[in-house]
C-alpha cells in the first residue's frame, strides 16, 4: 500500500508538471520556478510526516536525513547539466522537456541501483567499507576542487553516440528523434538527455553510498531520493544563481560525506542513532548557508 501511495503521488506530480504547468514550450520564470520547487519541497516534507505516522520516528529521521543529503549532493551536478545544455545550444524553452524525461530515467535507474546495492551489501557486507573510503575521499577532494568540469567532446559516451547513431546538428522543434529518408536521426535534445542520464548514474554512486550508511530500508532510500531530485529539477532554471550565492554548501557536503564515512567504520564500536545523523546534516548545511550569506554580504559592501 505504501508503494502505491508513493507512485500515485509521483505520477500526479509528473502529470501536473508536464501536462499542466509546462504544457507549452515556454521559458520558465524565476518566480514560477522557485514556487514550483517550494511546492515539491512541501510535498516531500509532508511525505516524511506520512512515514512518521506509518513507520515511526526513527524511519522519519532517516527519510529526512537521506532527503537532505541527496538534495545537497544533487546540487553538485547542476553545473554539468548547464554545460551540456550550453554545448548543444539547447534553448531554455526546450530544457525542461529534456529534464522531465531525465526524471523518468532517474526513477528507473535509481530503482535498479538501490535494489542492486542492497542485494550486494546483504551478500557482501564488506562493500560498506569500500563505500566509506569513497565517501571520505570524495569529501576530502571536494575541499580541494573549486568547480567540477566535464569535457563533453572527449567523453566515452559522447564519442560512442557520435560513432553509432545518426546525429543531426540542428534542432527540429522539441523532437528527440527525426525520420528522414526512412532513416532515424537523433537530435541534440536526445544526445543531451543521454549525457544527463549518464551523469545522474555516475553521481548516484556517491549519493547512494552515503545513504546506505544511514539506512538499508529500500522504501526510505528510494522515496527520499526521488523527492529530492524532483524538487531540484524544477528549480534548475534559477539554481545556477542559487548555487553561486551559496558557494560554501559544497564544504558542508564534504563534512557530511566524511562524517558518514567515519560512521561506517565506527558502527561496530559506536551506534550513532538516526537523530544524530540528521542533526549533523542539518547543522552542516545551515553553517554552509550562513557562511555563504556572510561572504556575499562582505563582497557586496566592498
From Swiss-Prot:
GO terms for cellular component: plasma membrane. It comes from the Bacteria. It is a multi-pass membrane protein. Its main location: membrane. The chain crosses the membrane at residues 1-21, 32-52, 67-87, 98-118, 120-140, 194-214, 218-238, 253-273, 274-294. InterPro entries: Integral_membrane_TerC, Integral_membrane_TerC_rswitch. Keywords: Cell membrane, Membrane, Transmembrane, Transmembrane helix. It is found in: Cell membrane. Belongs to the TerC family. PANTHER family: MEMBRANE BOUND PREDICTED REDOX MODULATOR (PTHR30238), THYLAKOID MEMBRANE PROTEIN TERC, CHLOROPLASTIC (PTHR30238:SF0). This is Uncharacterized membrane protein RT0774. It comes from Rickettsia typhi (strain ATCC VR-144 / Wilmington).
Amino acid at each position: 500500500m505504501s508503494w502505491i501511495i508513493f507512485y500515485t503521488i509521483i505520477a500526479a506530480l509528473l502529470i501536473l508538471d508536464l501536462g499542466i504547468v509546462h504544457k507549452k514550450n515556454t521559458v520558465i520564470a524565476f518566480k514560477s520556478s522557485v514556487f514550483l520547487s517550494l511546492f515539491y519541497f512541501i510535498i516531500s516534507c509532508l511525505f516524511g510526516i506520512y512515514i512518521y505516522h506509518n513507520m515511526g520516528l526513527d524511519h522519519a529521521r532517516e527519510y529526512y536525513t537521506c532527503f537532505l543529503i541527496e538534495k545537497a549532493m544533487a546540487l553538485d551536478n547542476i553545473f554539468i547539466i548547464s554545460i551540456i545544455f550550453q554545448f548543444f545550444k539547447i534553448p531554455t524553452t526546450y530544457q525542461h522537456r529534456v529534464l522531465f524525461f531525465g526524471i523518468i530515467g532517474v526513477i528507473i535507474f535509481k530503482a535498479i541501483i538501490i535494489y542492486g546495492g542492497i542485494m550486494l551489501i546483504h551478500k557482501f557486507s564488506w562493500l560498506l567499507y569500500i563505500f566509506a573510503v569513497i565517501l571520505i575521499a570524495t569529501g576530502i577532494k571536494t575541499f580541494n576542487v573549486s568547480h567540477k568540469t566535464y569535457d563533453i567532446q572527449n567523453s566515452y559516451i559522447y564519442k560512442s553516440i557520435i560513432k553509432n547513431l545518426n546525429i543531426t546538428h540542428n534542432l527540429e522543434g522539441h523532437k528527440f528523434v527525426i525520420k528522414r529518408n526512412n532513416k532515424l536521426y537523433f537530435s541534440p535534445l536526445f544526445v543531451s538527455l543521454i549525457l544527463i542520464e549518464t551523469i545522474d548514474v555516475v553521481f548516484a554512486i556517491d549519493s547512494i553510498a552515503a545513504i546506505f550508511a544511514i539506512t538499508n530500508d529500500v522504501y526510505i532510500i528510494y522515496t527520499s531520493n526521488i523527492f529530492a531530485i524532483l524538487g531540484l529539477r524544477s528549480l534548475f532554471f534559477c539554481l545556477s544563481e542559487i548555487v553561486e550565492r551559496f558557494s560554501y554548501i559544497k564544504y558542508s557536503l564534504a563534512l557530511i560525506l566524511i562524517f558518514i564515512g567515519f560512521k561506517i567504520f565506527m558502527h561496530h564500536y559506536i551506534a550513532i542513532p538516526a537523530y544524530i545523523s540528521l542533526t549533523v546534516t542539518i547543522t552542516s548545511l545551515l553553517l554552509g548557508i550562513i557562511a555563504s550569506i556572510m561572504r556575499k554580504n562582505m563582497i557586496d559592501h566592498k
